[in-house]
């Protein structure tokens, strides 16, 4: 069974935040060294979503279950991480963390992780610590583990701020 990296896309996703990682996983980063993964896409209901830039994506999966073949879950940032649709993703992110597979989050998806208490035991970054506290409320107790950097990797968890998409790609590839 081919290993898959599942990219979670919500309406108004930030298409550039996955633009470097997906091809590196699939095609590799060095000539003659092919990638080791298949990039798959998920939306909460399995229906097509549109990016901030107007790119329409048709997902492979809905959020009802995390595929057994999933070797990583990437939460792509965007404008809808506070929506009801986004709430369907929290159990999958928690399951991925329990399985010990890569969980990557960038931009507002990091704030979503804070809001669901998923960053409290790992070093992380985000758009700002103030934003993580605002979104997370009582669920976010990881302020002492926050680092003011473009991207942070702590074990199988990778986080990045909204301008750290290249660093996010690098840290996900190293995780």
Residue ranges and their predicted role:
Residues 2-14, 20, 27-45, 60-104, ...:
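Active-site-adjacent pocket-lining segments in enzyme domains
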Residues 47-49:
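Mixed-charge, low-complexity segments
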Residues 52-60:
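Short gly/ser/thr-rich secondary-structure transition/capping motifs
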